[in-house]
Design a protein with these regions (language model features):
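Conserved hydrophobic/aromatic beta-strand scaffold that supports enzyme active sites
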Residues: 18, 398-400
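Accessory RNA-recognition modules of RNA-modification enzymes
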Residues: 1-333, 338-346, 352
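Short beta-strand-to-turn element immediately C-terminal to the catalytic PLP-Schiff-base lysine
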Residues: 135, 401-402
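Short hydrophobic/aromatic beta-strand or adjacent loop that forms the aromatic wall/cage
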Residues: 128-130, 394-398
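S-adenosylmethionine
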Residues: 312-395, 402
């Protein structure tokens, strides 16, 4: 085990801080800017441009350092809690710095960023409504060690909502080497456990044809309560108030649009589709595009009473090439972590919408697409950032662009 004594520099995208050793960049986890630490090298090829390390002993701590509520996600442990040692307010400043730095580096924009807490957030714990676990060869539930295939058995998951904690997943033995999915939806629906995608009831799989594989999620946007049916194994915002935070931000960015045409890209099960349909009203039109067949099935059920919604199954690039809508007034998109990319941006701006509202979960991908949109006549006119993943480096943004 090679240890280096390092003086830690600024934060970097990905949950690291930057240090230097004999002129080489070292990305260090589990530390804070300004600290002096002993760091264990975890990736250190002699000819590599940079090394990776975990801070294993703090020689001079930052005033923002706190005891982690999840030691199993500390140095050498699992991923998913890499900022647990950082005070919650400082976590948000960390994320704001990363978003601003990516915009400066990739989009040549200097912009002050403030990361907002999720509604009702107090201590950064008990927010995950969905967790994914893997069992080891003895059937103990756990997670992969960071950047490893090794399963680390866990005794608790402090980020999970109480509905998941009450399932006592970590106090039981499960089949060996399986994937566990636990879902505790917001709004009163019963929690659900899947084992390798199969519903689990009591001590065994529930193989009945009508066994429950989906849940009902609820959120209030403005003064309206919305309800979505979502596959338990499908994609949904995992923070208990994430749908409210993002849905409200998107509707605020879209603005009043009675009778308008809105294009909803990467629409999933319809998180934004349903409230957008109400914004445009019965004389408007919402064209939703999603590539996952299961999500589209859920979206059809969710939007069955809104005839102004059109659903299209297929990749965004493919569907946009079919001229499903010529000139939308607004485009809303929520792409995967890799972002929309140049081709989607070019097809999007060719339709000349008045406004683009972009939901992003990766600051680097967002900044790259901010540059693409700006070069094509759509400057960034609004940006909000949300801390929907406390104790981790992840951050959600809602960006607005106007022609």
């Amino acid at each position: 085990m090679t240890l280096l004594e390092l003086t830690v520099g600024p934060v970097a995208h990905g949950g690291h801080c930057v240090a230097r050793h004999e002129g080489r960049v070292v990305f260090v986890r589990h530390t804070l800017p300004g600290e002096r630490v002993l760091a264990r090298l975890t990736e250190a090829e002699p000819d590599a441009r940079f090394w990776r390390a975990d801070a294993v002993e703090v020689l001079e701590p930052s005033p923002d350092r706190v005891p982690s509520p999840w030691p199993e996600a500390g140095p050498g442990g699992v991923g998913g809690g890499e900022l647990g040692h950082v005070a919650l307010a400082a976590q948000r400043r960390w994320k704001a710095t990363v978003v601003a730095e990516q915009l400066h580096r990739l989009a040549r924009l200097d912009r002050e960023v403030v990361v907002e807490a999720a509604p009702g957030e107090t201590d950064g714990l008990g927010w995950r409504t969905r967790i994914e676990l893997t069992t080891d060869d003895a059937g103990r539930p756990g997670m992969h060690r960071y950047r490893s295939e090794e399963v680390v058995p866990l005794s608790a998951m402090p980020l999970a909502v109480s509905g998941i904690v009450d399932l006592d997943i970590f106090g039981r033995r499960w089949p060996a080497a399986v994937r566990l999915t636990a879902v505790a939806p917001v709004g009163g629906d019963r929690p659900l456990v899947l084992v390798d995608g199969v519903p689990w009831s009591g001590d065994g799989p529930d193989r009945r044809p009508n066994a429950r594989t989906s849940v009902r999620e609820r959120a209030v946007l403005a003064t309206t309560e919305y309800s979505w049916r979502v596959a338990a194994a499908g994609f949904w915002q995992v923070h208990r108030t994430g749908p409210t935070a993002l849905g409200t931000a998107v509707l605020d960015a879209v603005g009043p649009r009675d009778g308008a045409t809105v294009l909803d890209l990467y629409a999933g099960a319809g998180l934004f589709t349903l409230p957008l349909a109400d914004v445009v009203g019965p004389s408007g039109r919402v064209v939703a595009v999603e590539g996952d067949p299961g999500a589209v099935r859920d979206a059809r059920r969710n939007a069955h009473d809104r005839p102004q919604v059109e659903l299209h199954l297929g990749g965004v690039t493919e569907v946009l090439g079919q001229d499903v809508v010529a000139h939308p007034d607004v485009v809303v998109l929520d792409p995967p972590r890799v972002g929309a990319g140049r081709e989607v941006v070019e097809r999007l701006v060719a339709m000349r919408p008045e406004r683009v509202v972009y939901v992003a979960c990766d600051p680097a991908a967002l900044a790259r697409d901010v540059a693409y949109l700006g070069q094509r006549g759509y400057p960034l006119t609004g940006l909000r950032a949300f801390d929907l993943f406390p104790m981790t480096h992840h951050v959600e943004c809602v960006a607005t662009f106007d022609r």
